[in-house]
Swiss-Prot record:
Signal peptide location: none
The keyword Transmembrane is annotated on this UniProt entry: no
Protein name: Putative agmatine deiminase
Substrates-to-products reaction catalysed: agmatine + H2O = N-carbamoylputrescine + NH4(+)
Originating gene: aguA
Superkingdom as given in the UniProt entry: Bacteria
Length: 361
């Protein structure tokens, strides 16, 4: 057994620290991306082009789709023929750690499509479970095998200074690691991520089908500084969830003992839902979660991605689009804050942060 990353001196940097690059996956799963994923592919392309201005983008695309991806992206990315079941690079890619000598270590978690047989979203996830190790191998990075511990990248945020942010709703979900206690889960995170402290938010975003990943509800924008998804509408189920998170964060400190500065980032004013027009576009596998008309989608501006030169922020043709851009522009004065029309990614079940995974410098 290899020593834990913590014992070996590795830690997980913050997303706002310098990147070597970003991992993404071409969207092709018919049960996630309606109408051959045409609209999603346009959105992915805009995201890739924006990120590529400041860092390398690695795109996993199987041979059958390579010429299609090249028709959108040309030579803007590094193409890797690694098989996948879907395009959620945040959740299937490795968590890459660094040490003080600049060496990298890729953590490979078990992936079971957000809940396995208990409440997973699809049952054919064998390729997805291999993405982290195969990608690390392609990069020539050593791998720390954290299996059978189940975790997705969207379930953790790091401040790069010893603090990890998670939600209880996800990490304590019966579909993840039901045989482990909360204390055992926390210890695994600390050892695997080289961290000192885990902060457990009670909730994520209402009806987030990942069991409420933290990356949809809260994110570090600097040391001891966070954004939190918020609504003032007390009739929205999100209100009580965000309020509980805020109350916890206001009492908490980071690993260094600092209190948090918390910026409230409004959720879209208008509920984002699946429409009748969306439904004919999906083709499902057996055992795959199906969409229904009127289903509320877990839309949140917190699902942004911090690239080297830009912050990419979901946009929903909503009155709060600009509000979110303005708040994040103040948080990131040294980066270009770019709004990306994101409903077509949201229809797949996630957003910009869910389809990207940073590779630290």
């Amino acid at each position: 057994m290899m020593d834990s990353p913590k014992k070996l001196g590795y830690h997980m940097p913050a997303e706002y620290e310098p990147h070597h690059g970003t991992l993404m996956i071409w969207p092709t799963r018919p049960g996630s991306w309606p109408f051959q994923g045409k609209a999603a592919k346009r959105a992915f392309t805009q995201i890739i082009e924006t990120i590529a201005e400041g860092e390398r983008v690695y795109l996993l695309v199987e041979q059958a789709y390579l010429s299609e991806a090249q028709s959108y992206l040309g030579d803007k990315v590094v193409y890797l023929d690694i098989p996948t079941n879907d395009a959620w690079a945040r959740d299937t890619g490795p968590t890459i750690l660094v040490n003080d000598k600049g060496k990298k270590l890729a953590v490979d978690w078990a992936f079971n499509a957000w809940g396995g047989t208990y409440d997973g979203l699809y049952q054919d996830y064998e390729e997805d479970d291999q993405v982290a190790s195969r990608f690390a191998e392609a990069l020539g990075r050593p791998v720390y095998d954290a299996k059978p511990f189940v975790l997705e990248g969207g379930a953790i945020h790091s401040d790069g200074q010893g603090t990890i942010l998670v939600t209880e709703s996800c990490l304590l979900s019966p579909g993840r690691n039901p045989n482990l206690t909360k204390e055992e889960i926390e210890n695994t995170l600390l050892e695997s991520l080289g961290a000192e402290k885990v902060i457990w938010l009670p909730y994520g975003i209402y009806q987030d089908e990942t069991n409420e990943h933290v990356d949809n509800v809260a994110a570090f924008v600097g040391p001891a500084e966070l954004v939190l998804a918020w609504t003032d509408d007390e009739n929205d189920p999100q209100y009580a969830m965000s309020k509980a998170d805020l109350e916890l964060l206001e009492q908490e400190t980071d690993a260094k003992g600092c209190h948090f500065t918390i910026h409230k980032l409004p959720i879209p004013a208008v509920r984002q839902v699946v429409t009748e027009e969306d439904l004919p576009g999906y083709i499902y596998e057996e055992g795959e979660e199906k969409r229904y008309a009127g289903e509320r989608l877990a839309a949140s501006y917190v699902n942004f991605y911090i690239a080297n030169k830009a912050v990419l922020v979901p946009q929903f043709e909503d009155v709060n689009d600009q509000v979110a851009l303005d708040i994040l522009s103040k948080c990131f004065p040294d980066r270009k804050v770019v709004g990306i029309p994101a409903r077509d990614i949201l229809l797949g079940g996630g957003n910009i942060h869910c389809i990207t995974q940073q590779i630290p410098e």
